[in-house]
Amino acid sequence: MMNNDIQTFLKKAGDSACYVLCLLDVAFSDNRPFDLVYCLQTIVNKGWVRSDFYVLRPDLILQEFTGCKWEVFKAGADYVPARNEYEIDYYERGSIGHFDRPNFHPIVNSRTVKEGRLASKRICRKVV
């Protein structure tokens, strides 16, 4: 069943959910099928993401959809991820920021990625 105001919810996701989409790309990197709208509504309803899609608990988002504990940390642009780590890149162009992954692009041909600079990385790894 869809929530009321789903169109406004999805518009906000389209405008601002690049980090969330990159986290879901990590969570479903094993190519399992998933319901994107369900995932977005779940993480907002649980309070791990604000209604404007600002991410508060990336570790719990990954745990929800993988069943494993995760740690997520901010690293410098020059950080080289280990084999067991997943990379999410953060680009800046003026006052605009955008998250992107090496093999997943929430916005194909993003001006922020093409014309901006790699400012930092978010590194995700399972806790063993």
Task: Name each model-derived stretch.
Residues 1-49:
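Active-site nucleophile-adjacent alpha helix/oxyanion-hole segment immediately C-terminal to the catalytic cysteine
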Residues 28-127:
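Conserved active-site-adjacent core of cysteine acyl-enzyme catalytic domains
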